[in-house]
């Protein structure tokens, strides 16, 4: 049985709760460390999902939960905000199980039992985007959508059921070739299979965090509104809506604009 290192903070000013949990390795795991922090708006009776920002290599995104921009974005959809400090992005190390264990523990600590069932939306930068993709391949039924920004070592094997999870894959026009090619080839190899994915190129940008938040947030809100069923029971496993092949995002490569369309 895994041990839990638990810390609790109550933020009175913003009427929210912040919880910290670390999940040490057990005898079968090899992910090194897995630390999590979650923010929950005190006025939210029932959460609908978890917005998770994942850090780049050797990073730590736990402080993201105190960012008011992410808090406001999340609370509009009745989402929690999650940050993490994770070393390994390969699910066979047990890191995926550690994430699920952390959510089950947060469910008990916060008295939000729905945390054991509600879906994640993951926005990952660089290494964090690779983690988002790998976690989605491992547990597609728990992912409402994800963003992967400019990683270069995404798993290139078949994505299987993850092709049904809406994704925004972003490369930088001036980033290193191997990063552009890794993500572009994954996209091109899976679109013929019906992958519900977008490939976007940030003009004039290298390996930097995307700061066009209106664009990123629009994708998040659109996907959440389409995928989470209305009047669903959030206290049991949730069957997310599948996106119809008759809708999609059409990009204009000359103007760098993107629009949701119905065919």
What are these regions (language model features)?
Residues 45-46, 93-127, 137-140:
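Gly/Ser-rich "nucleophile elbow"/oxyanion-hole loop immediately N-terminal to the catalytic nucleophile
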Residues 46-50, 77-82, 117-119, 140-145, ...:
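Loop/turn elements at helix/coil->beta-strand transitions in domains of secreted/extracellular proteins
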Residues 3-13:
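Sec-dependent N-terminal signal peptides
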Residues 144-218:
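The feature captures the conserved acid-bearing segment of alpha/beta-hydrolase catalytic domains
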Residues 261-263:
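Conserved small/polar residues in nucleotide/adenosyl-binding loops
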Residues 54-58, 125, 132, 136, ...:
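Cell-envelope and extracellular/periplasmic
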Residues 16-50, 120-143, 153:
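A domain-start/cap signature at the N-terminus of enzymes
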Residues 44-91, 177-179:
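Short substrate-entry loop that stabilizes the transition state in hydrolases
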């Amino acid at each position: 049985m895994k041990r839990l290192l638990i810390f609790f903070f109550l933020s009175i000013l913003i009427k929210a709760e912040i919880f910290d949990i670390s999940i040490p390795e057990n005898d079968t795991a090899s992910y090194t460390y897995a630390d999590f922090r979650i923010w929950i708006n005190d006025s939210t009776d029932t959460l609908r999902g978890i917005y998770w920002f994942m850090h780049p290599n050797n990073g730590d995104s736990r402080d993201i939960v105190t960012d008011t921009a992410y808090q406001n974005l999340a609370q509009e959809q009745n989402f929690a905000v999650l940050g993490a400090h994770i070393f390994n992005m390969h699910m066979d190390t047990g890191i995926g199980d550690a994430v699920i264990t952390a959510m089950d523990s947060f469910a008990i600590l916060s008295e939000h039992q729905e945390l054991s069932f509600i879906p994640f939306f993951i926005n990952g930068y660089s290494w964090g985007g690779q983690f988002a993709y790998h976690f989605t391949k491992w547990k597609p039924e728990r992912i409402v959508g994800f963003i992967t920004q400019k990683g270069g070592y995404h798993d290139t094997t078949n994505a299987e059921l993850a092709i049904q999870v809406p994704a925004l894959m972003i490369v930088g026009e001036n980033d290193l070739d191997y990063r552009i090619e890794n993500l572009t080839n994954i996209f091109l190899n899976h679109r013929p299979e019906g992958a519900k994915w977008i490939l976007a190129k940030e003009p004039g940008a290298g390996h930097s965090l995307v700061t066009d938040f209106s664009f990123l947030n629009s994708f998040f809100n659109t996907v959440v509104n389409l995928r989470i069923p209305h009047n669903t029971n959030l206290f049991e496993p949730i069957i997310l809506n599948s996106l119809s092949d008759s809708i999609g995002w059409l990009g204009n490569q000359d103007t760098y604009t993107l629009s949701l369309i119905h065919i």
